From Swiss-Prot:
Residues 39-1024 are extracellular. It comes from Arabidopsis thaliana. Pfam families: LRR_1, LRR_4, LRR_8, LRRNT_2. GO terms for cellular component: plasma membrane. This is Receptor-like protein 1. Its main location: membrane. The gene is RLP1. PANTHER family: RECEPTOR-LIKE PROTEIN 1, RECEPTOR-LIKE PROTEIN 14.
């Protein structure tokens, strides 16, 4: 016993001594690390570098944008190892080994030169990592060492020059950086042949990122100089060389990214078999199509990941089979056109090591039951196809190790039993919805699943009461989407209580009637209950219960009352949408001062009032502000100046008055300005700094005066000035904006000449000049608007002929691939809301809240067609093409070239002085829906071919001098007499005039016919002198007879005068009663 006690006595002190020794060692190391201080020469070098970078930023721009470059780099702070963006070695005299200088300098225009002086880096001989991305440098320079500048940095291994504006001129400088192992040149302006010969000395490269440049050819020398290269990224270039894969051959290459190049044939990849160590091959977004021939991949024995998404494959090679190495673990076929049968699936089902498979966004119709044999499959995405069949049976046969299953947006119908997932013990993500019907989702009430979901998507389904019972067993949910499920009653507070890690809950498009919040504070980040039927007021303590909310959408409900002040406690809130409710009152000061992280604030279509943005406002992060459709009054206050990143401002349809304040021009990033429908007045808004303005809508106000001649909006895309009181000339500078697409000047008093500065590069698609005071000829230069789709020059005083060159204008004839930016006004795609519990995968899965939030609807354009104004927006606007020249003083004939506008849908030439006949070429306008030629001087007959215009929904050729029989056949039988009135010589249906009585027998000879015509003309001559004498005699005779009759018969005379007196009495009595009323 004593021996054991002595042993225990010795062991205890030994343990204590060991702990003490470890503690002392850690303290010494910590103190030594804390004593690290940088070398003085390097400290001074950093200060010189800061000074150089600051000089690249204009002092005024720095002040306005709030830039403060490298604030901690000062003379007062001696230890530069403590400075931001600086990393030092662990030695006592620490050398600078890392500089992270990304995103310091604001965006430069393409015409601006911004040089990086490499000699400033010579002070850091131990530098290992340098990041200068996102600074928009254009070139490198070194007046001391020239191209050999990087040679002094022989420890440099990582260099990041991505997202600048470098071109090939930097290549000789890079060739001296022989120690670099990782080089990033993504998103620059490099082009030509890859790899450039000048890079032959960079033999130590392991990682080379050239994404998003313009390399189009590959050197025949290939990658022989880069023998150790393991990762090569040439995505988003123009690589289309037929010998691409031969040039890329290098023994050690493990990852090859050729995403989004114009490769079109797998035969271009024959040399891939030499890449024996290749593990990752990415060919997304190329131009491969039709059947996939994979025999060129069969020798890649190490291949583990293959990305063939975003191509045009329609099928797999059945003859050879799917010759993909069995080592494959990740296969991505999403966004192709695959329509696989059972035999087509078999090739995939032979890949027994497959762990992740994405077949989403194809044309699949049959369920791939053979996937149940893939015992290692953990990720399966079949979303956005046309799958149908017995869903419960298919799901029950899937591998038990499955973790991720997406069946969103298919053609499933009927019921789905949730307990068919009984074999799935590891399932964490489940997604289900249908495009064609409502899926009845049910489960057994007693079933308790073995899995715990993290993400559940069940949108556009019908959840039974037992299904909600299933959710009670889930305690680890992070993301829940139950939108469009016909849910009723109260907001499911229990779902929030049971899942303490819940970050996102989407309940939009249901029929919830009450919002009841949990009592305890919760970490919820995304809450969407839009488009329900909630009539409550918003609880005052909502900001206390959900202080971590980042996204809050309460729009399209029936909320009443005021906005809670406690929302100001949501310090992380980025998007707040309470539009289309019944909220009233003023904006709380606590809300305006506390939500400094807010980027999107949408309060449209409520009953809010008062003045906005006093000095208390502190919305410094605001990017988009939507206050349209309220009752705000007064003028804008300067509190908005704190929102220096404000990009979109919409205050339309309020009661703002007075002049637009000059300070609004100091919001330098303002790109979208909507102020229509107020009571603003004064001259055209003067924006001092306006390089970014894309959309300006100040219509329906009382602005007056002329537009300054020197107005300059280089980025302008849409300008709306209609329904104001502007006068004077339209400045030519407006048309110099290269991207101008919409110009609406209707209902003003502009005059003078127009369009004198238009050139063939103009992208103008919508030009509306209705109801102004233009009095000139329509200039021929207007035909240079080759992309125009809607043109309205009506209700002016244009004179002269219609230009025949209108046929050169597209009106939809030239549909190019350029997306009409006017379809989507504003996109917050850079604001993402993905939960932290996002499923980990090598696939690019679409998880979380939608990646972009677009709170602004598509552009709306009103255009007169079918005798009424129609509103066109979104994709419909893309296909609407119309020409309106009505109510002018145009003369001459309708040019036959008008028939070349074959995609036009509305043509209005009414109320002019046009003569001649209706050209037969109009019958070529097969897409025409509205034709108005009324109130002109057109003559001749109606072309019979008009009956073949099957799309015509409105026809008006009234009040002309047309003659002959109406071709009442084909589509013209749908129009009644109103389309033809005012043409005295038209006959036939639908009029009541018979054409037979007006027909003249065919003359026997030319001389007889001429004689008949002469006699007819003589017989039709009226002697006007005899006509006047006859009328006078009849009038006098009738008057004498009336007076004699009344004089002779006294009874009739008394009755006559009685009736006259009675009529006068009734008139006087009616007049008195009207005055009294």
């Amino acid at each position: 016993m004593r021996t054991d006690e002595r042993r225990r006595w010795w062991v205890k002190p030994k343990k204590h001594i060991t702990l003490v020794f470890i503690t002392i060692t850690m303290i010494i190391q910590f103190q030594m690390k804390g004593c690290v201080s940088c070398v003085e020469t390097e400290r001074m070098g950093l200060l010189q570098l800061k000074s150089y970078l600051k000089n690249l930023v204009d002092a005024e721009e720095e002040e306005e944008e709030g830039l403060s470059i490298l604030k901690s780099w000062t003379h007062h702070e001696g230890d530069c190892c403590r400075w931001e963006r600086v990393k030092c070695s662990d030695a006592i005299n620490g050398h600078v080994i890392g500089l992270s200088l990304d995103r310091l300098v604001p965006v430069a225009f393409e015409s601006q030169t911004r040089s990086l002086n490499l000699s400033l880096l010579h002070s850091f001989p131990q530098l290992q990592s340098l990041n200068l991305s996102w600074n928009w440098f254009t070139n490198l320079s070194d007046h001391f060492l020239g191209f050999k500048s990087f040679g002094t940095l022989d420890k440099l291994t990582t260099l990041d020059f991505s997202h600048n504006m470098f071109d090939n001129s930097i290549v000789p400088f890079l060739n001296a950086a022989t120690s670099i192992r990782s080089l990033h040149l993504e998103s620059n302006y490099m082009e030509g042949v890859f790899p450039p010969q000048e890079l032959s000395n960079m033999t130590n490269l392991r990682v080379l990122n050239l994404k998003d440049n313009s390399f189009s050819f590959l050197s025949s020398q290939g990658l022989t100089d880069f023998r150790d290269l393991e990762v090569l990224d040439l995505s988003f270039n123009g690589v289309n060389d037929s010998e691409a894969s031969h040039s890329l051959s290098t023994a050690k290459l493990k990852t090859l990214d050729l995403n989004f190049n114009p490769l079109s044939d797998f035969s271009q990849l024959k040399g891939l078999e030499s890449l024996q160590e290749l593990q990752v091959l990415k060919l997304r977004g190329n131009k491969f199509n039709h059947t996939l021939s994979t025999h060129v991949l069969k020798d890649l024995k190490m291949l583990q990941e293959l990305d063939l998404s975003d191509n045009g494959f329609t099928n797999l090679d059945h003859g050879r089979g799917l010759e993909i190495p069995t080592s494959l673990q990740v296969l991505d076929f999403k966004r192709n056109q695959l329509s696989l049968t059972h035999e087509g699936y078999l090739g995939i089902c032979r890949l027994m090591k497959l762990r992740e498979l994405d077949l989403s966004s194809n044309a699949l119709t049959s369920l791939p039951y053979c996937l149940g044999n893939l015992t290692h499959l953990r990720t399966l995405d079949l979303s956005n196809n046309q799958l149908n069949g017995n869903l419960s049976s298919f799901v029950s046969g899937l591998p038990s190790v499955l973790e991720y299953l997406s069946l969103l947006d298919n053609n499933f119908d009927g019921s789905f039993l949730f307990n068919s997932l009984v074999n799935q013990t590891r399932l964490t993500v489940f997604k289900l919805s249908s495009k064609v019907g409502v899926i009845q989702v049910q489960t057994e009430s007693s079933w308790a699943p073995l899995f715990q979901l993290k993400m559940l998507y069940l949108s556009n389904c019908s959840l039974g009461s037992t299904m909600l019972g299933f959710l009670v067993h889930q305690r680890d949910l992070c993301f829940v989407d139950l939108s469009h499920n016909k849910l009723t009653g109260t907001f499911p507070t229990w779902l929030v209580k049971n899942n303490t890690r819940l970050q996102t809950i989407l309940l939009s498009g249901n029929s919830l009637t009450k919002l009841q919040l949990p009592i305890l504070v919760h970490g919820l980040q995304v809450l969407d209950i839009s488009s329900n039927m909630i009539y409550d007021s918003i609880q005052e303590d909502i900001g206390m219960v959900f202080p971590n909310l980042r996204f809050m959408n309460f729009s399209s409900n029936h909320f009443q009352g005021t906005i809670p002040s406690s929302i100001g406690e949501m310090k992380s809130l980025q998007v707040l949408d309470m539009s289309s409710n019944g909220l009233y009152g003023q904006l709380p000061i606590m809300f305006l001062s506390g939500c400094y992280s807010l980027r999107v604030l949408k309060l449209s279509n409520n009953q809010l009032q008062g003045k906005i943005f006093s000095k208390h406002a502190n919305l410094t992060g605001l990017v988009g502000l939507f206050l349209d459709g309220n009752n705000f009054t007064g003028s804008l206050e300067e509190g908005l100046l704190k929102s220096k990143n404000l990009t979109l401002l919409d205050i339309s349809d309020n009661r703002f008055s007075g002049m637009l304040p000059l300070w609004i021009g100091r919001i330098s990033r303002l790109s979208y300005l909507y102020m229509s429908g107020n009571q603003l007045k004064g001259p055209f808004p003067f924006l001092r700094q306006s390089p970014w303005v894309e959309v300006m809508d100040i219509s329906h106000n009382s602005f007056s005066g002329s537009i300054p001649r020197n107005v300059n909006f280089p980025s302008l895309r849409e300008l709306r000035l209609q329904n104001n009181e502007f006068t004077g000339l339209v400045p030519g500078n407006l048309f110099k904006a290269a991207g101008l697409e919409v110009l609406d000047l209707r209902n003003n008093n502009f005059s003078g000449k127009i369009l004198n500065t238009i050139d063939q590069t103009s992208k103008l698609r919508i030009l509306l000049l209705r109801n102004n005071s233009f009095q000139t000829y329509i200039p021929g230069k207007i035909c240079q608007l080759s992309e125009v789709g809607l043109l309205d020059l009506s209700h002016n005083q244009f004179r002269g002929p219609i230009p025949s060159c209108f046929s050169k204008m597209s009106f939809g004839a030239e549909q190019n691939d350029r997306t009409m930016s006017l379809v989507a006004d504003f996109d917050f795609s850079y604001i993402t809301f993905l939960p932290h519990c996002q499923y980990g995968s090598h696939l690019n899965l679409d998880d979380g809240v939608r990646n972009g939030y677009q709170p602004k609807p598509a552009t709306v354009v009103d255009f007169l067609t079918k005798s009424r104004y129609e509103a066109y927006q979104g994709d419909i606007l893309r296909y609407m093409h119309g020409l309106d020249l009505s109510s002018n003083e145009l003369s001459g004939e309708i040019p036959i070239e008008i028939g070349d506008l074959q995609n036009i849908r509305s043509l209005n030439l009414s109320s002019n002085r046009l003569t001649g006949s209706i050209p037969d070429s109009i019958s070529k306008l097969k897409g025409l829906e509205s034709l108005d030629l009324s109130n002109n001087k057109l003559d001749g007959s109606i072309p019979p071919a008009l009956a073949d215009l099957n799309s015509l929904g409105y026809l008006n050729i009234s009040y002309n001098n047309l003659s002959g029989e109406i071709p009442f056949k084909g589509h013209l039988v749908t129009f009644d007499e109103r389309s033809y009135i005012g043409n005295a010589h038209l006959c036939g249906l639908p009029t009541n005039k018979n054409c037979i009585s007006q027909r003249v027998p065919e003359p026997p000879s030319v001389s007889t016919h001429a004689k008949e015509e002469e006699n007819e003309e003589e017989g039709n001559v009226i002697d006007m002198v005899w006509f006047y004498w006859t009328c006078a005699a009849v009038y006098i005779s009738t008057s004498l007879a009336l007076f004699a009759f009344l004089y002779i018969d006294s009874r009739w005379s008394r009755e006559w005068f009685y009736r006259v007196d009675l009529c006068v009495h009734h008139i006087l009595q009616f007049k008195r009663s009207s005055v009294c009323n």
